[in-house]
């Protein structure tokens, strides 16, 4: 990390027994000021007051939280972890972990690529098979589909990244460009920059 006051960098590694993994793929700062990190192979962990704490990597012996690709928080302070092949996990304020896998939710895949929860209630879930929305209050999940025609809603179903702006627009990065989707009743737009 970089200390602005001292103008120096500090290297933190697994070799120093400071963190559980050296392969960090995502980070998130929650409302309590904790810095969360997702890793390949050793799950999620967070830093608070200079100390790192690890989240359990197995749940009920059949769910693995080893490969965490994305992290976000809802308005209730629940932490959501998206994994590469094992779905979504919610850590509530009491430390309980709840899995949301394709077997339990009806999603087409357990490969979670990205999250956005800008309003604190609607968790937009990017996957290798489309974009879903979960209401974090009711836990209902729906696939965002194009109801106006037989065509797919998005140019590409593999969602790489999502950003929700202050207008409610979802900026969705895919392998074939960018889609802009609105959460209000306005048509979406597909944009391809410099491509075919």
Where are the language model's segments positioned?
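Carboxylate-rich, polar loop motifs that coordinate divalent cations or form catalytic acidic clusters
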Residues: 1-196
């Amino acid at each position: 990390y970089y200390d602005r006051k001292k103008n120096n960098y500090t290297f933190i590694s697994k070799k120093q027994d400071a963190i559980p993994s050296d392969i960090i793929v995502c980070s998130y700062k929650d409302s309590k000021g904790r810095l969360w990190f997702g890793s390949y192979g050793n799950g999620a962990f967070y830093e608070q007051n200079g100390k790192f704490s690890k989240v359990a990597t197995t749940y009920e012996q059949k769910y693995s939280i080893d490969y965490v690709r994305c992290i976000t928080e809802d308005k209730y302070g629940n932490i959501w972890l998206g994994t590469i092949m094992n779905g979504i996990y919610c850590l509530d304020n009491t430390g309980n972990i709840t899995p949301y896998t394709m077997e339990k939710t009806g999603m087409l895949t357990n490969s979670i690529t990205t999250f956005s929860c800008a309003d604190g209630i609607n968790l937009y879930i990017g996957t290798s098979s489309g974009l879903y929305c979960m209401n974090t209050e009711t836990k209902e999940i729906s696939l965002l589909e194009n109801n106006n025609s037989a065509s797919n809603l998005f140019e590409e179903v593999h969602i790489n990244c999502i950003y929700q702006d202050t207008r409610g627009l979802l900026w969705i990065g895919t392998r074939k460009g960018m889609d802009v989707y609105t959460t209000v009743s306005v048509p979406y737009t597909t944009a391809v920059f410099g491509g075919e």
